[in-house]
Amino acid sequence: MINIMEVTETNKMVEKENLDVRTITMGINLLDCAGPDLAEVNEKIYNKITTLAKDLVSTGEEIAKEFGVPIVNKRISITPISLVGSSACKTPEDYVTIAKTLDKAAHTVGVNFIGGYSAVVSKGMTKSDELLIRSIPQALAQTELICSSVNVGSTKTGINMDAVRLMGEIVKETAELTKDKDSLGCAKLVVLCNAPDDNPFMAGAFHGVTEDDAIINVGVSGPGVVKYALESVRGKSFEVLCETIKKTAFKITRVGQLVAQEASKRLGVPFGIIDLSLAPTPAVGDSVAEILEEIGLERAGAPGTTAALAMLNDQVKKGGVMASSYVGGLSGAFIPVSEDQGMIDAVNEGSLTIEKLEAMTCVCSVGLDMIAIPGDTPATTISGIIADEAAIGMVNQKTTAVRVIPVVGKGVGETVEFGGLLGYAPIMPVNKFDCSAFVNRVGRIPAPIHSFKN
């Protein structure tokens, strides 16, 4: 039974503690738009998206107004475009025409982003996969709202090192083609291992082939709420700490469940999942790093950080699972550097390095996220970073990802400003030693022994 105290508590979460629904994401299947004629494919894609998602933004705004809960983003995820364009696209430029169509459709319906300019190449690359991947730099340079992702490995298949090597080059090329905007294109490009089919968060969202024709997935955000709750239990035992996080996560997720069901009902689209992720913003008091400091660390990155993050992640899941009928996506704590003021402060004070962030990715939601690195970082070094993250995901049976921005013309000690939810970031140093002889081997890294479950 809900009592009046809980109602006022939820109001306080929204008013003072930065509780919001980070995104309502509509997943749309575009496989029925495939065909041999490129102009026809583009027309079908545009028509399907603008028909199914025409009321997405207005519905989100109505729900936000009625329930008093801010809904920050309305987004679309689509079937990986390497599949949709495989018959019609013969060159990377052909795929870029689809990117422009998607961008136009996204502008027409008014969403913040559209994700799914993607390829799933966990074991091998088809010709169309490779064409799409090679088109990514142009696509991101010539569009505004497109997000791109490439899945290069999984626990079941191992790591496709040919794709990893290629993605290092693609990240560099994307940085170069968007250098007039501080290499912003790379902020909309993520390389994943074990990518989920139902992720509502960008840039890794795509509508997997296992999904319904259309679906509503919701991502909730509440680092500020968790931090405020923990302020009242300073110095208490781990048991009290864990219970507090769990109860808070339950309340946050309940808000997401309410919004998801309402959006599903009004749009006439089935409800998919709630993503339990704690997603920070650059706003002060809306930071995962500040939660870790409230738990007892002087700064994020201090000894004990990985343990504190593991505990936070686990309790968020335990609390959230009870509050929703379906949980999915990434569901954990995000640790993006540029989007989290506490992380930025930790980097500036020398407490947090890329190596420590990599350790933290073993126990949190995704991976090395929104990290600005020197523009002269070699492509093979970026591939090495991607391979390391993919290995963590593959062996630990979890989603991992890399979204690094090699900012052209900038080096360690400088800062890059992305604006909005993407925030700003200090350029972080990268290990200078070479890994090209490793990265340039062809083939794939086999799946781990514990992946054989049959």
Swiss-Prot record:
It comes from the Bacteria. InterPro entries: UPF0210. It holds the Pfam family DUF711. Belongs to the UPF0210 family. NCBIfam families: PRK05313.1 (NF003700). Homodimer. This is UPF0210 protein EUBELI_01067. It comes from Lachnospira eligens (strain ATCC 27750 / DSM 3376 / VPI C15-48 / C15-B4) (Eubacterium eligens).
